[in-house]
Amino acid sequence: MSSTPVNVTVTGAAGQIGYALLFRIASGQLLGADTPVKLRLLEIPQAVRAAEGTALELEDSAFPLLAGVDVFDDAKRAFEGTNVALLVGARPRTKGMERGDLLSANGGIFKPQGEAINSGAAEDIRVLVVGNPANTNALIAQTHAPDVPAERFTAMTRLDHNRAIAQLAKKLGVPSAEIKKITIWGNHSATQYPDIFHAEVGGRSGAEAVGDQAWIADEFIPRVAKRGAEIIEVRGASSAASAASAAIDHIFTWVNGTPAGDWTSAAIPSDGSYGVPEGLISSFPVTASGGRFEIVQGLELDAFSREKIDASVRELAEEREAVRALGLI
């Protein structure tokens, strides 16, 4: 076992996703069963007391890998020496709120967090933004951390990726483990494009295995893209445990690598691949090795896929222009 604990900062730690996430991190599921962790919980002042209650529960669980828990309401202190940051806390969209108001409110959260990461985080910092609008929140944070390599800022589309695997496995009546090379393209929003044309199921193309283009276009894609809204309607609250599980998956894969013969999906800064403007934080098919994500190259895209990707990328570009106009980047 490594003797030096990894510092993991979780924002919005008193929320439902935070609660579902923290115990799994402390148990070793984020980084592995031989890596001790120190948890640093960041909350707004009015939620610090609740976060302190979660810290007491974490202590009571006596996790062998948990080297300590600290609670903060100051971003500079919370990110001091941090190796892994999960930015979960964000301002949710409320009824009647315009998109500009939402972006502005989240800019007030992610700008200072980016600055705090820039000034105090460890040199090997890795950042995953979970709080929505995740791609653009990640862009805001990354812009305000100019001394941190841009590739260290990512946004989560692993939940969409996992949802796509689950829906395809259910349709075909196979275990989810048999589904390989699913891709989520673009924004973590209703415009995202879940792509099964390069997926593999028992050696066959996912689309060929389904054999029903109408199901792909009219049921699969909207079901995955709008699954969050479906869960809110059924559960009466937003996805929490599944979002936490996807965040664990994202970081674990980033640190430990993708399995041979497979890839995953992550929103990372574009290098211009597949016509996505450079610098946009967009979801791509990626592999991970040596602690780095790499975009899978050379995939052929038909007109259907190209149209779907372009629509989501346009939305990302519009969000970037909106936060630029607000002076947030």
Swiss-Prot record:
Positions contributing to substrate binding: R93, R99, N132, R163
Main enzyme class: oxidoreductase
Alphabetized GO MF terms: L-malate dehydrogenase (NAD+) activity
Residues reported in the UniProt entry to bind NAD(+): G12, A13, A14, G15, Q16, I17, G18, N106, Q113, V130, G131, N132
Active-site residues, Swiss-Prot/TrEMBL: H188 (proton acceptor)
GO-annotated biological processes: malate metabolic process; tricarboxylic acid cycle
Record keywords, A-Z: NAD, Oxidoreductase, Tricarboxylic acid cycle
Known EC number: 1.1.1.37
Annotated catalysed reactions: (S)-malate + NAD(+) = oxaloacetate + NADH + H(+)
Highest taxon of the lineage: Bacteria
Family named by the database record: Belongs to the LDH/MDH superfamily. MDH type 2 family.
Function: Catalyzes the reversible oxidation of malate to oxaloacetate.
Protein's name in the database: Malate dehydrogenase
